[in-house]
Design a protein with these regions (language model features):
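A short, flexible loop at the N-terminus of ABC-type nucleotide-binding domains that lies
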Residues: 1-5, 9-21, 27, 68-70
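Conserved ABC ATPase "signature" region
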Residues: 98, 102, 109-127
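Walker A (P-loop) phosphate-binding loop of ABC-type ATPase nucleotide-binding domains
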Residues: 36-40
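Conserved ABC transporter NBD signature motif
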Residues: 57-67, 73-74
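Helix-to-loop junction immediately C-terminal to a conserved catalytic motif
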Residues: 49
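Catalytic Walker B motif of ABC-type/P-loop ATPase nucleotide-binding domains
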Residues: 156-159
């Protein structure tokens, strides 16, 4: 499974260009997407999940062209874990996942089998009778990961999955993504370099709608050597000026 993005542009009605003639190949395995807020990462994921139609350019998923006639076929191949998880707070974990399985059109017996499997894989089996509103942020992310995997997608997209989590939960989520990437392509979007160093062999660095770098983490670190420094100052205006540069 691979994703090919060619000359992709997304321009909004207010004139803002969120993605600017971008090209990218996402291979099988876990692929990192690194960039600051406003770099265009979320817009790219909205395109890849068929939520947003690009202004121009092409995207293909396993040789299937992104077009209105193919969206339903593409959606069956994609699982998505958004940054914010808000899944039916009055339902238990199992009830929530059973409902998501129904929405995905999964046969009852098969749905139960998959739910049991993924609850065990994500260490949620002992919490399946808890209401969603009783779960910690990390547990909610894990439930979100299960719902994204229920229909057995070939391409899993995760948006900032470790943001706001404690160190132990962050490591758990990262390990799960590495595990699930053995059977599918995973796009891991984050602004935390440590997460990508622990999980990805390849990544892309995004800024202002363009990809500044694509390649391995080791190559990126080699390129950065001698070009990174730390400056401590109490002058806020100077700090902002340095940040702009």
């Amino acid at each position: 499974m691979s994703i090919h993005i060619e000359d992709l542009t997304v321009r909004f009605k207010n004139g803002v260009t969120a993605i600017n003639h971008a090209n990218l190949n996402i291979p099988n395995g876990i692929f990192g997407l690194l960039g600051e807020n406003g770099a265009g990462k979320t817009t790219l994921m909205r395109v890849l999940t068929t939520v947003l139609k690009p202004t121009s350019g092409t995207v293909t998923l396993d040789r299937i062209l992104y077009s209105e006639g193919n969206y339903e076929k593409i959606q069956r191949k994609i699982g998505y874990l958004p940054q914010e998880i808000d899944l039916y707070p009055s339902l238990t974990v199992r009830e929530c996942l059973e409902y998501m399985g129904d929405l995905a059109g999964i046969e009852k017996r098969e749905s139960k089998k998959r739910i049991d499997y993924y609850l065990e894989k994500t260490s949620l089996a002992d919490h399946q009778k808890k209401k969603m509103r009783q779960l910690s942020g990390g547990m909610k992310r894990r439930v979100g990961l299960v719902q994204a995997l229920l229909h057995e997608p070939d391409f899993l997209i995760v948006d900032e999955p470790t943001t706001g989590l404690d160190p132990e939960e962050r490591i758990r989520i990262r390990n799960l993504l590495v595990d699930f990437a053995e059977e599918r392509t995973v796009l891991f979007s984050t602004h935390v370099v440590e997460d990508l160093m622990a999980t990805c062999n390849q990544l892309a660095v995004m800024k202002k709608g363009r990809f500044l770098y694509t390649g391995t983490m080791r190559e990126l670190l080699n390129k950065a050597r001698g070009h990174v420094w730390e400056c401590c100052t109490e002058d806020e205006s100077l700090a902002r000026e340095l940040e702009r540069k």
